[in-house]
């Protein structure tokens, strides 16, 4: 759940929802925080949100080769989402899938990347969760670029993970499938969250562990069943990751511990940054979790109690410990190098946007509109073209109400697809103070033409109008990145 992009979607809510707004529910356990209610998404919504399940939006390990792929996306209200798409052999019975998803979707905690919805249409089975923008624990431990994760942050990760498991256990969801460093994510504030995806199997009768068998609980190898004690064993392997900065097989780690070679187990990058007492206690906890006999392992409640006493620098924000930019810091970054169109969208200069769109015409539609038009020249197609021409005349003469009507007739005709028409109707909606409809068109322009920076810049203008400045800035940044990629290919 990681790489940056700006993929939004259209929320076409089914009739049984009260309105197109996000339904929310308070959570007393989390300080009365308001959470989005679990919902069923349409497949078309999730296609739009992920750019048609574009490979550019894959954020899961092993990319497209994984049996179940996770995509980054964005809903039309600006929220980032993670979408897990199961392979077509998983969850043949959609009712079982829905029941399981609803059960997991009822959980709400600051320690989880919460499940906010699902989708089942035909053979498709998808889960939708909150998106965590700052990568996985595996990335920060095993593939760090600038600085290793600090000791205090590693202890915080261990505690938050234990608290997440305790919360799930208290809610009747004690089983977690394939717990590992890739399941621990970091939110916008750098706080660790446990992915909700592991609370469901990869299929109704599928495997609960996909990692190397060397990291699998011994009882699972014997019985094929996951128990709460199996989860504690896997938690112990994550403790090893945190201590060593490497993915060490439990058997090897235990050999080092029994041989009193604990120093060889610890990450050399942490030398001098923790006390012997703290290191010894964490090794002790890991050893207890990794006991061969399941009954000899601690429960998650006792793990939380032990880890609370080890915490350091508790008053320091996670994003500071992680060394990652925060929202307030992001505002101070160097300004983007914008094209004239991008700059006009930054300033929400609608007149300038209209002039540039009029000037570039339909050159960006090359290879799109005709390629998607399979019908012969019929009366219906001629009517659509006439509607587009009338819309263009109204657009140039700044009669934006007429432009919206004519472009709508062209789009509804369905005989041709044009990102430029969506861009022009987007601007026409903005001129008529209808930013939400404008954003929908900007999103659709990107769905039709995923590599078109203009769509991203227009999304930024719409988001600025809607008061969503942080998301608008991100859309500008993504548009600039896409513009640079296109320039490099020329």
UniProtKB/Swiss-Prot annotation:
It is found in: Cell membrane. Phosphorylated by BRI1, ASK7/BIN2 and ASK9/BIL2. Changing residue 210 to A: Slightly reduces BSK6 protein phosphorylation. InterPro entries: BSK (IPR045845), Kinase-like_dom_sf (IPR011009), Prot_kinase_dom (IPR000719), Ser-Thr/Tyr_kinase_cat_dom (IPR001245), TPR-like_helical_dom_sf (IPR011990). Gene3D superfamilies: Phosphorylase Kinase, domain 1, Tetratricopeptide repeat domain, Transferase(Phosphotransferase) domain 1. One of its GO terms (biological process) is brassinosteroid mediated signaling pathway. Its main location: membrane. Interacts with BRI1, ASK7/BIN2, ASK9/BIL2, BSK1, BSK5, BSK8 and BSK11. This is Serine/threonine-protein kinase BSK6. It comes from Arabidopsis thaliana (Mouse-ear cress). The lineage of its organism: Eukaryota, Viridiplantae, Streptophyta, Embryophyta, Tracheophyta.
